[in-house]
Amino acid sequence: MNMPKGPLTNILVGINVLIFVLVWLGGFQQQAVIEGALIPARLTGALGSAGAYDFWWPAWVTLLTHAFLHIDFSHLLFNMLILFFCGRFVELALGWKLMGLVYLTGAIAGGLAETAWSPGSLNPVLGASGAIAAIIAGYMVLFARNRPKPVGPLPAEIARGAQLLLLWIGLNLMMAFAFGGDGIQIAIAAHIAGFIVGLVLSRPLLILRYRNA
């Protein structure tokens, strides 16, 4: 299989890796979490006295910044390998602008979903979970080997989307069960929200791209 070039994909991978290296070499891990991670209670205004801290930027900015921070090297490596492979194929189909839209929308949706799930939580949310989930869904939709088939009253595309979503939810629940005992927190809400973004946006954006070509 020939790998598409994917310039935006390479840039996104490069940015994520560069930020990780700078944070860890500079010893800025704690500051990066405080300033860049998404803290649901901060976004909802439920921080209480802790909200008096002089943050660098408004809480809404962390809907994006959290997606460029990673807990450790294995977290970064896992996300970047998926992005490196799936991202360039989605970019091939949609073009760099629309692929970037899917990626950033997935990141924001993931952050909002985690906030809605635990609005008063002080646990920081880090990682490109929502963005990567959106790219995975886009890859599954745009490069499916078999044509979708209707299921009962459900049209083919909706039926396939529902099947993929159920599969994705099941996979995430299995991951949470398998790794939860090791203290690893799986951002299930972010994964699901990002995946839905990819399911919903990918084919309409593909049609839009070639309609305007």
Model-derived features with residue positions:
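A detector for small-residue-rich transmembrane helices and their helix-helix packing motifs
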Residues: 1-213
